[in-house]
């Protein structure tokens, strides 16, 4: 790594961290890449799951974190679940959702296919795949046209409402019915329930985020919460259900190429000065590369060295052949993991790693 750094500079090095480690490990890994390699080319698996959600949340509410824990469902009157199958993928969260439904909360479950959680739903919504934006915009249309929004909350906390009104004007449920496959009357019914409930919360998974229009999907959900005032109170909020056990913590800790810990931009000079003072060295002033861009750069001989901790891009990358070609072209690859992964076959150096039960904290 030092030879590459001295010969080519930090831009020819990168790191791929883990969403399965602790917050402290995520923080230390991104700090190591930024401090030792002198680059912001550090990422983790959020790029393959909820990066679109983080982008929309940063844009919409100023933070890439969930605005409420899944335990908030216990206080909710209306729970909306879309693009997720909590019983299979988030069983603890699913328990809270089912208990809330049993206590009388309205449960709206959106999915192109039937799922087990629909047994508890007051309103199961089966729609055509890929039509999320059309369906969600029709909900926004109903809420705005029927004046079900929270005008006081909008005046105090929301920008761009009039622009949103114009955007969704042509997305009536009647026009969208053929596209989404959901009847106009049904859309109006569950839109009214979501808007009129005192406390509504939205949960979504990678069925929302893993799309070419994933950010737009998330924007629609954020808009639904904001215009109805269902953010910032107990039993309300926005909760993207993460893919691995600590994607949220790793993101919060700065394991992302464009932000430091707490989602502070690497291009903000005041923020950068703060971290330079704390870490005792000058830092890269430019955004780093995402793992997708990193793989392309490696194939094009623009990155020579990579440190992978607790990740397995040889298996997790959507284009495995491309990822494996990239890994094979690296001049130096270090892999740190609890297991001998497919990625480790390409490594020049393999470091051990502790599994969760082996850690003291």
What are these regions (language model features)?
Residues 1-359:
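Catalytic alpha/large subunits of respiratory electron-transfer oxidoreductases
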